[in-house]
Amino acid sequence: MIKKELQFLRNLVKKQVNEYSVIFINGDKDYNGVLSGYLEEYEQKEIDQKLSLVSNNYYFYNNPSTFVGDIILNRIDLNTYPTFIYSTAQIGLDINRRSFIPNFSSLYNIHSLSSGGYQLSLMQNKYHYYQLAKKFCRIPKTYIYRDSSFDFSKIEQSKKWIIKPNLECSARGVKLIKDINELKNEVIVASNIYRQDILIQEYIVGREIEVPILISKNKVIALPPIKVNKNFEYLSQEIIDTEKYSFSILQGKICANLQKTAEEICTNLEARGLCRIDFILDSEENFWLFDIAALPLISTHSSCYVAFRDIFPNDDSALYEAIIGAGLSWLV
């Protein structure tokens, strides 16, 4: 059933390959000093190449300012075909960092292949989406440190805790605290570095599972859950940056429940395009929401790529065609 639904989206692309435009907008980590969520150069080049192969009218910008200027000065034809953007660019460092380009583009009837500006901001804010998702699944006990008025005495000393910046991704600033006596200092240090709220979250022992979700006009499609294979207690910034982990397809009856829950969360958040819901699966097969990726990585070393490869072996275009097809579905 999943393959049939994805193939329908791919067929939209194959039938209309000359009748739409795609603009990929990136901004490297030096563009405005972003702390996380940027693409490495080799990832950007891979995505650029593969998007260009599934659109006959294709543009790439590695500077969001140049894109904005070209639109304002009418240097891109927006009238002949529907135009889509796939933007990984970030403007600024606050919660709206990913929203500027989609919001600006909507003024010119350019359609986003990801969620809209509001949803991107919502899914940037971990503490808020935990509150919205807790009616669908378990959430680890979570406190939010905003300033020095926080009462550390309420933290249970018998547990291990994870600290993480509220607005960052890619494990930026994530740290496992085993000694409760170090917690306060580590939180204050993180707050000073990242200049944002810091989450203090109960550490759940278990396997990390990622569930890619593709949202089209008429369907929320949960792909096969992917297991993160690692020899570490958790994915830290260093492990992610050096890719010291791999992916494999999760097996077992729990998969259907994970997929259903991931679909419910994305529907509740009104997400669009490709998203990813990350869980921790404990020894009793209880699953806990760990993270939400509004713009998950789609290069070769990613759970999204592995999920599509499982459904469409040896077909590198499948993932990219499905993303564009989901965008086209809203115009049919």
Language-model features: locations:
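Amphipathic alpha-helical segments that line or abut small-molecule/effector binding pockets
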Residues: 151, 256-263, 317-328
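Phosphate-binding site of ATP-dependent enzymes
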Residues: 180-260, 281-288
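C-terminal active-site "lid" helix and adjoining low-complexity regulatory extension at the edge
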Residues: 281-332
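ATP-binding N-terminal substructure of ATP-dependent carboxylate-amine bond-forming enzymes
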Residues: 1-112, 118, 128, 146-153
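A short, flexible beta-alpha/helix-coil linker loop
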Residues: 28-32, 167-170, 243
